[in-house]
UniProtKB/Swiss-Prot annotation:
Annotated organism of origin: Clostridium botulinum (strain Eklund 17B / Type B)
Positions contributing to substrate binding: 76-78, 114-115
Entry similarity comment: Belongs to the MoaC family.
Active site feature: 129
Name of the molecule in the record: Cyclic pyranopterin monophosphate synthase
Gene it is expressed from: moaC
Entry superkingdom: Bacteria
Keyword Lyase found: yes
Amino acid sequence: MENKFNHFDNEGNAIMVDVGNKNATERIAIASGKIRVNRDTFLAIEQGTAKKGDVLGVARVAGIMAAKKTSELIPLCHPLMITNCTIDFELLPKTLEVEVTSKVKVTGNTGVEMEALTAVSTTLLTIYDMCKAIDKAMEISNIHLRRKIGGKSGDFINE
């Protein structure tokens, strides 16, 4: 089986893949990533005392908005009618990390992997933005696709 990039034509020009002949099916993508912060920042996030307000609440909304805007950020992504997007947080006190997980659903003819990854990335960047006044050394890491369900290429699990 030959692997080839499908966003290029035979001359190497960037193209948007034609998904018009694909069946509309339910597709789900789950992505996650982490941000490591210092102890003061972790406590401010956990206790909701950051100067800019509810860090996780604002970050959640930013992530959902980003999922909806992915095609405006990633040049060859199709605009999608997302049917659901959730952003969840796990506070990890031992490592002073916040883990973000996004789950995006669509009933359509192309997947939502980029939407899930964009949601996680933007959520993490929003946490950074809201906390940078007290912690400029925060580190964002391990952004990755954990699971893809549905579509022509089948399911993918990376957990």
